[in-house]
C-alpha cells in the first residue's frame, strides 16, 4: 500500500497506471479509499501478465507462493521483478522464478531487491536498491522511480541486510 500511494503521488505514474492486488476485499477497499483510480484485483496472474514492473511486496514466507502463482505469465525479456521481501535473496528469487518451468535456460529474470521505509508514502523514503541481471537502463529506471519517492541508493546485495535495518529503524532516529 505505501509504495502504491507514493507512486500515485509522484509524476511518473498515475493511480490508473498502478494495479494493486490483495487477498482480502478489506485491503482492496482501503486502497480504493486512498485513490479510486487504482486498478484493484484479487487476480495476481492477470496483474502480472499486463505489468512492465512487478513489485512483490509481501511477507517473506509468501514470496515463493506468489511467484509460483504468476511465473507462467512472466516475460523475462520485457518485465522487471522488484522484491520488497526482507531477507529473500537473489538466489532464492531466481530459484523460485525458474524452477519447474519451460523457460529457455538462457532467459534470466531481471530482479531488483529494494528496502524502502514507511516514509515512502509521503515521498521521503531512503530506499536501498540492489540489482541482478539488470541493464544500465533498467537500473537507472528503478533508481529514478525510487528517487522520486525520496532517495534511492544502489548497493550490493550483501549490504541489503544493513540497509534493511537502517531503512526500517532509521526513520525513528530522524523523528
State the predicted function of each range.
Residues 25, 44-56, 60-129:
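Rossmann-like NAD(P)(H) cofactor-binding subdomain of soluble oxidoreductases
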Residues 1-2, 160-164:
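Small-residue (G/A/S/T)-rich helix-start motifs and N-terminal tracts that mark the onset
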Residues 92-110, 126-162, 173-175:
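Internal alpha-helical scaffold of NAD(P)-dependent oxidoreductase catalytic cores
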Residues 30-61, 131-142:
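Extended low-complexity acidic/polar segments
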Residues 1-50, 124, 151:
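NAD(P)+-binding Rossmann beta1-loop-alpha1 motif at the extreme N-terminus of oxidoreductases
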Residues 167:
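Phosphate/pyrophosphate- and phosphate-bearing ligand-binding catalytic cores of soluble enzymes
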